[in-house]
């Protein structure tokens, strides 16, 4: 079947769906940049089926009336609107359909819904109201303070979406067979798939996997949840509600708070409930502690809330969004806190990185496990926001790894160390911190060297002591995060993990010793394709080529159990993984040479004329600048013979290519300046007319910078 994915962005859900569908179908992707773009894409692809896994705009009538078009909605049947997950995580439970009253009077549910779902429905004129082809549900606990909208989306929502989409496709195939009375075993005539196919009533009432009705309560269409309705009041809301509001707004747009001056979007929402909280006698909203660039404030019910990140509010005069950065640097810059005067009522983290046994903010900790044979294993959990690892966070990780090494003695040896990421394993360097730096190139250099130091521990320091290293991917990984995993002796990955090894799409050569680890693991040719194709890779695909060693079933607690079981068996049977290293020179000299060569290329990416490719792409990514077109590597329906994306060409690596671009840009800027000076010279005689022409010209040239 030919399937077209229409999406606002090729995100974690659409990538997972793409990888699943391509096993059986011919799939192509188009960014929904405009109505005309979507109509043109459908015309070029001429698909049998269109699926919209992540779409924030309306499907054009010309598309859904001609092609069977499915919308993946992150809500249960009957729910509708763009803020489904947000409302659910805040405590909307369907008992009161007057959502404005719920918001204004804080009539949120005490415990929230027990279940939520994902619905695959057919696109029609009315938003999220078409015939249901399939839906799936999952359990949810909205007061688990570690769950955010984005982590729920990457986890349970994505898994449910895959089940619902697969079921919907099967049902559409069945309906197509029935329209032409195709015999069992005969190939389906895909041309029979049309918007006129009819669903069955039970598709709306019974879940795809179990056939059960929706167990999460009554649902109804809900409006867009505006930023003004997401804020918290420290004099009215307790820790649980504030946590809900912040976590429900995670990723986009953030929780807009007016409790600090100036107003800003905040992220995090983790609850602090240490035994000392009852002794801290300060007003609600008062800052009571700092930890790893996060800040905690007191709540009216005697607990605390951690703000880990913040973002300035975009003004009408701001060309783009501001970066999302760690809270403390932002708060200091805005004058919200003075570190010299900020009290520290909360206990410090343990020096040995032990896990705390009460609700708090702790993004990195170590647990030691002694298996039945008496051998010791260290589990290092690191759960950095959005998987990004800043310079400071990399240094913290190095300190934790050093602490683990110090426990390894002749009398009490350590057999293995396991790197456990969080809902993301790692996405490499912290682009938002880099973008917000006064000198992004310098911060990029510091960050890449810091993450290289982390990987050197994995490749060398543990290896020379005979300690097995294991990377256990419970969540997605990208760029330097994939290289971090690849450096381990053994890579375990959950079956739902998606990996994006390439750096080029961001305009980087990449470091993290990837030129030696990828070569050792997958070979030269496969490694070249990993980096140049710039396509997502599933856990099973990664295993097929050697990037992953073992794919484990399950997720959540079941995956954790599988990881511990596999590591215990590995250690107890004295297995020595890491065969990929056997023919490699991993001596200190070879590693230093590799690092120097990679950093030589990265220096070009940070400071030479070629740096344009990285600095511009990083800025667009961080500030959420809308793409101008879909990359041809995704939009197969647009690619002509021999046609390449800019990042796919060899010239993308040449400094000369970008030096010419710099000269051309400078010439255009000079010409623009000359034209503006000419306008100013004429302004005295015809001021009104010239001002209007000048205004229109600026809007045309800089329209992308002056959106509200």
Predicted feature descriptions by range:
Residues 2-4, 55-218:
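Donor/substrate-binding cores of folate-linked one-carbon enzymes
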Residues 320, 324-418:
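Conserved CoA-thioester-binding segment of acyl-CoA-metabolizing enzymes
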Residues 375-377, 394-442, 453-470, 496-498, ...:
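A structural preference for short, pocket-lining loop segments at secondary-structure junctions
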Residues 548-613:
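C-terminal long alpha-helix characteristic of the crotonase
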């Amino acid at each position: 079947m030919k399937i077209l994915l229409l999406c606002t962005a090729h995100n974690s859900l659409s990538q997972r769906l793409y990888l699943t569908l391509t096993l059986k179908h011919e799939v192509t992707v188009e960014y929904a940049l405009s109505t005309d773009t979507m109509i043109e894409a459908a015309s070029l692809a001429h698909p049998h089926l269109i699926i919209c896994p992540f779409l924030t705009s309306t499907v054009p009538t010309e598309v859904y009336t001609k092609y069977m078009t499915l919308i993946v909605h992150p809500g249960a049947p009957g729910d509708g609107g763009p803020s489904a997950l947000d409302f659910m995580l805040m405590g909307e439970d369907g008992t009161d359909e007057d959502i404005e009253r719920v918001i204004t009077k804080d009539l949120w549910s005490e415990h929230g819904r027990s279940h939520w779902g994902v619905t695959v429905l057919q696109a029609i004129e009315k938003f999220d109201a078409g015939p249901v082809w399939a839906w799936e549900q999952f359990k949810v606990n909205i007061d688990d303070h570690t769950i955010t909208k984005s982590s729920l989306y990457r986890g349970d929502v994505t898994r449910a979406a895959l089940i619902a989409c697969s079921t919907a496709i099967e049902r559409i195939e069945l309906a197509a067979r029935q329209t032409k009375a195709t015999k069992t075993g005969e190939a389906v005539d895909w041309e029979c798939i049309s918007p006129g196919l009819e669903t069955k009533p039970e598709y709306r009432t019974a879940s795809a996997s179990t056939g059960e009705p929706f167990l999460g309560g009554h649902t109804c269409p809900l409006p867009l949840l505006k930023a003004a309705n997401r804020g918290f009041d420290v004099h009215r809301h307790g820790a649980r509600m504030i946590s809900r509001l912040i976590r429900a707004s995670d990723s986009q747009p953030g929780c807009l708070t007016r409790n600090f001056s100036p107003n800003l979007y905040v992220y995090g929402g983790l609850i602090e409930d240490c035994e000392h909280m009852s002794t801290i006698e300060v007003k609600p909203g008062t800052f009571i502690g700092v930890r790893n660039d996060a800040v905690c404030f007191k709540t009216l019910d005697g607990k605390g809330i951690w703000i880990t990140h913040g973002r300035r509010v975009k003004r009408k005069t701001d060309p783009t969004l501001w970066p999302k950065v760690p809270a403390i640097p932002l708060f200091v810059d805005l004058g919200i806190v003075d570190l010299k005067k900020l009290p520290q009522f909360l206990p410090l983290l343990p020096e040995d990185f032990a896990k705390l046994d009460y609700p708090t903010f702790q993004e990195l900790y170590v647990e030691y496990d002694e298996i039945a044979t008496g051998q010791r294993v260290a589990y290092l959990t690191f759960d950095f926001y959005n998987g990004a690892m800043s310079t400071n966070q990399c240094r913290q990780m190095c300190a934790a790894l050093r602490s683990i090494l110090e426990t390894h003695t002749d009398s009490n040896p350590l057999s293995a160390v396991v790197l456990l990421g969080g809902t993301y394993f790692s996405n490499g360097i912290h682009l938002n911190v880099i973008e917000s730096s006064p000198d992004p190139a310098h911060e990029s250099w510091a960050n890449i060297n810091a993450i290289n130091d982390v990987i050197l521990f994995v490749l060398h320091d543990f290896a020379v002591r005979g300690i097995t290293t294991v990377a256990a991917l419970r969540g997605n990984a990208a760029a330097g995060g994939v290289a971090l995993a690849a450096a381990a002796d053994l890579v375990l990955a959950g079956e739902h993990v998606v990996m994006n090894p390439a750096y080029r799409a961001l305009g980087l050569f990449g470091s993290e010793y990837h030129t030696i680890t990828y070569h050792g693991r997958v070979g030269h040719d496969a490694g070249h394709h990993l980096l140049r194709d710039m396509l997502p890779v599933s856990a099973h695909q990664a295993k097929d080529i050697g990037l992953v060693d073992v794919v484990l079933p399950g997720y959540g607690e079941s995956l954790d159990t599988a990881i511990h079981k596999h590591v215990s068996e590995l250690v107890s049977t004295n297995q020595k993984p890491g065969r990929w290293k056997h023919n490699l020179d991993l001596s200190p000299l070879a590693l230093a040479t590799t690092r120097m060569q990679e950093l030589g290329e990265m220096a070009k990416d940070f400071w030479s004329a070629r740096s344009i490719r990285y600095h511009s792409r990083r800025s667009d990514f961080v500030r959420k600048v809308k793409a101008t077109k879909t990359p041809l590597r995704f939009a197969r329906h647009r690619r002509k013979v021999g046609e390449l994306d800019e990042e796919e060409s060899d010239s993308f690596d040449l400094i000369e290519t970008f030096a010419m671009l710099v000269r051309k840009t400078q010439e255009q800027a000079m010409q623009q300046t000359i034209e503006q000076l000419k306008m100013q010279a004429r302004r005295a005689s015809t001021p009104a007319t010239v001002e209007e022409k000048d205004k229109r010209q600026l809007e045309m040239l800089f329209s992308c910078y002056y959106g509200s």
